[in-house]
Design a protein with these regions (language model features):
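Glycine-rich, N-terminal phosphate-binding loop of Rossmann-like dinucleotide-binding domains
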Residues: 62, 80, 232-234, 262-263, ...
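Conserved beta-strand positions in the Rossmann-like core of class I SAM-dependent methyltransferases
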Residues: 178
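Rossmann-like adenosine-cofactor binding region
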Residues: 184-300
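Short, conserved loop/helix-junction motifs that constitute active-site signature segments
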Residues: 66-73, 89-95, 249-255, 276-281, ...
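N-terminal glycine-/charge-rich "phosphate-binding" loop or analogous flexible N-terminal tail
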Residues: 1-55
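Phosphate/diphosphate ligand-binding glycine-rich loop within oxidoreductases
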Residues: 52-133, 143-147
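Glycine-rich NAD(P)-binding loop of Rossmann-like domains
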Residues: 129-165
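C-terminal helix-to-coil terminal segments
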Residues: 22, 100, 104-113, 127, ...
Length: 351
């Protein structure tokens, strides 16, 4: 049989037979080659230059060939939702190759992380765990020492697929949702999501927010809108680096918001964050990402009792690969049908 497509599957896991059957049904003329790599491998697996020259599709995470090796490459599916690892790469910036993220894979588990850490803070769970380890029964000083989530306002900085799932969970807790996007979404059509969304999850129609904000000119207005919880889900670009800094912490101090960062560490100025914590401008923070990352053992940020830090693991799930493969198969089917790919990275914007 003559094959019109060659897919190089470069991952730490092999493609399941059921998945292969699905994609071959969509495109019988596609050949799939699996090449194993360790999760954090730094070098490409041994693949001949002849094979690279024939490849039309690549499934990878952080390993990429030089653009000169892949004259026929048309589509790269990333294992990750973020794509800042591509910035400055000629394969990304100087070609017409379509890059697609795995947006839609992470929202369930990351939204769970956001609310498990926020509710743990609200309900004093870290303190109770310390008491438990010390075998101490310490009664709360009052029955009103806990603020539940009903009626609180969550501001979601970056209303993509992760932010939309956070909104869904927030609404279930009875919270009010405000959304901020980098670009204006002032019509019902513009508020619809173009990313892959699992049925029954997220906010594909953009129905949950009671207020929308957009652009640099409305950032501080958004932060000044009496937010109880600020969730940052932004990618890292030149526009978003340091988007929450000293001026923004001053604004957030009005309500003493709690901050949750599941985007990228450099979206927050670490020095300004620590100053805000020292001065009591915010109630606390939950950080799955930091700047620097990994956070050095002697870093001051470790020492705050009102800060929860985890090692960039909020996206971990035993359904991770299953969901990524579902997104990838969906895109391969759309490609075979001549339809636009979902989660297509905008090279001009960098996400």
């Amino acid at each position: 049989m003559t094959y019109s497509d060659l897919l190089l599957f470069i991952q730490p896991f092999s493609p399941p037979e059921q998945w292969l059957q699905r994609v071959r049904q969509a495109n019988p003329a596609m050949r799939v080659e699996y090449h194993h790599v360790e999760m954090y491998a730094k070098e490409l697996p041994p693949i001949s230059k002849e094979t690279w020259a024939e490849a039309t599709i690549l499934f990878t995470w952080q390993l990429f060939p030089p653009k000169e090796w892949v004259p026929k490459l048309q589509y790269i599916q990333l294992l990750s939702a973020g794509c800042n690892q591509l910035l400055g790469m000629p394969l990304f910036e100087d070609t017409d190759i379509a890059f697609c993220t795995s947006n839609g894979n992470h929202p369930p588990q990351i939204a769970e992380w956001v609310f498990s850490t926020f509710l743990a803070f609200q309900h004093h769970i870290p303190e109770y765990l310390e008491n438990q380890r010390a075998r101490k029964w310490v009664d709360p000083p009052t029955d009103e020492d806990t603020e539940d989530a009903v009626g609180l306002r969550i501001g979601i900085l970056g209303y993509g697929c992760i932010g939309r799932q956070c909104a869904r969970v927030a609404k279930a807790f009875g919270m009010d949702v405000y959304a901020y996007t980098l670009h204006s979404r002032d019509t019902p059509e513009s508020r619809r999501s173009e990313d892959y969304t699992e049925p029954g999850l997220g906010d594909p129609e953009g129905e949950f927010p009671s207020a929308w904000f957009a652009g640099k000119e409305q950032l501080n207005e958004f932060l000044a809108s009496d937010l109880d919880l600020l969730v940052i889900t932004l990618p890292l670009t030149n526009q978003t680096r340091g988007i929450i800094s000293g001026e923004q912490f001053d604004i957030l101090s009005k309500k003493k918001a709690y901050i949750s960062n599941v985007g990228r560490g450099p979206c927050i100025s670490t020095e300004d964050l620590m100053a805000a914590l020292d001065e009591g401008k915010i109630r606390g923070a939950a950080l799955d990402v930091t700047d620097p990352e990994p956070l050095p053992a002697n870093h001051k940020l470790w020492g705050y009792k009102n800060v929860i830090i985890t090692p960039h693991c909020s996206g971990n799930s035993n359904h991770y690969y299953e969901r990524v493969l579902k997104i990838f198969a969906y895109n391969l089917e759309r490609r075979a049908q001549g339809r636009p790919l979902v989660n297509h990275v905008n090279k001009a914007l960098g996400y």
